[in-house]
A protein has these predicted regions:
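Transmembrane helix boundary and interhelical loop/hinge segments in multi-pass membrane proteins
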Residues: 49, 68-86, 100
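Aromatic- and glycine-rich beta-strand/loop motifs that create alpha-glucan
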Residues: 1-22
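Long, hydrophobic alpha-helical segments
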Residues: 54-75
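Transmembrane helix segments
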Residues: 40, 157-210
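Secretory targeting signals
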Residues: 36-37, 44-47, 60, 102-162, ...
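Alpha-helical transmembrane segments of multi-pass membrane transporters/translocases
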Residues: 208-244
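Hydrophobic alpha-helical transmembrane segments of multi-pass membrane transport/permease proteins
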Residues: 19-39, 58-65, 169-175, 229
Length: 244
C-alpha cells in the first residue's frame, strides 16, 4: 500500500508540472457548461436538474479521458524508463494501481470543478439532489472504466497518439453497445444470449441507471468489473513487455 501511495502522489503531482492539466480542466469545464446550457437547452426545459449536463458526459469522456490515459504507459515506453520501473522493488500491481488511481483522482478533480452547476440548480429550484449525487458517482465510475481501458492500451504502444485513438475507439464501442440501432443490427443474426451480452456491455445503460438516483449493486459491480478487467489486461501486457 505504501508503494502505491508513493507512485500515486508522484504521478498526481506530475500532472501539474505542465500547463496540460490546467488546460484539460478548463476545457472540461467550458465544454460541460456549453453543452448543458446551449446544446442541452437548460433554460428552455424549465426544469431544475442536471440531466442535460450528465447526458453529455459519455461523449465528453470519449475525447478527454484518452487524453489523460494516453501517457500512462506510452510515455514510459517511449522514454525507456519502463525498463527501470520494472526493475524497482515494487510489484506491477503497485505501479499499475498507483498510476491508475492518480489519473482517476485527476479526472475526479475536474468533475469536482463542476459543483457550482449543482449549486446553481439548487438556487433556481428544488432538484432531486439524491439523483444528482448518484449521477456524479456514476460519472466518476464511468471515467474510471474509460481510464482503465486507456491504461491497458497505452501499455501496448510507445505512441501516445496511437494510444489515444485506440482508447477512444474502444470506449466508443462500449458507449454504442446499448444503442437500439446497434442492437437491431445484431438481432437478426446473433442468438438472444449474445445480444443480451452486447447490451450488457453498454456503459450508457449502466450510467443512465445510476443517474436516475438508484445506486444498484449490478451497476456498481459492472464498473468495478470493467476497471478490474482492463487493469488485469494491463498487467498481462506489461508482463509480456518485461519478458521481451
Amino acid at each position: 500500500m505504501k508503494n502505491i501511495t508513493i507512485i500515486l502522489n508522484r504521478e498526481f503531482a506530475s500532472y501539474f508540472t505542465t500547463p496540460v492539466a490546467y488546460v484539460f480542466i478548463l476545457v472540461f469545464l467550458v465544454l460541460s457548461s456549453a453543452f448543458t446550457f446551449y446544446l442541452g437547452q437548460f433554460y428552455e426545459r424549465g426544469q431544475a436538474d442536471l440531466l442535460p449536463f450528465f447526458n453529455f458526459h459519455p461523449w465528453l469522456y470519449l475525447f478527454l479521458v484518452p487524453a489523460v490515459s494516453m501517457r500512462l504507459w506510452s510515455e514510459e515506453r517511449a522514454s525507456g524508463s519502463i525498463e527501470l520501473l520494472l526493475t524497482l522493488p515494487i510489484t506491477l500491481w503497485d505501479a499499475i494501481l498507483g498510476k491508475f488511481l492518480a489519473a482517476w483522482l485527476f479526472t475526479g478533480l475536474a468533475l469536482l470543478g463542476t459543483f457550482p452547476l449543482w449549486l446553481s440548480v439548487n438556487y433556481l429550484g428544488e432538484p432531486d439532489n439524491g439523483a444528482i449525487a448518484a449521477s456524479y458517482v456514476g460519472s466518476w465510475f464511468m471515467a474510471g472504466a474509460f481510464l482503465a481501458v486507456g491504461c491497458c492500451l497505452s501499455a501496448l504502444t510507445k505512441s501516445q497518439i496511437v494510444a489515444f485513438i485506440l482508447t477512444g475507439t474502444v470506449c466508443l464501442l462500449l458507449v454504442l453497445a446499448g444503442f437500439p440501432l446497434v442492437l437491431n443490427f445484431f438481432q437478426d443474426w446473433v442468438p438472444a444470449l449474445i445480444l443480451d451480452l452486447i447490451a450488457g456491455l453498454s456503459v450508457i445503460a449502466h450510467f443512465m441507471a445510476i443517474s436516475k438516483g438508484v445506486l444498484a449493486l449490478t451497476d456498481v459491480i459492472y464498473f468495478i468489473a470493467m476497471i478490474g478487467l482492463w487493469l488485469t489486461l494491463t498487467r498481462l501486457a506489461l508482463q509480456a513487455k518485461a519478458a521481451d
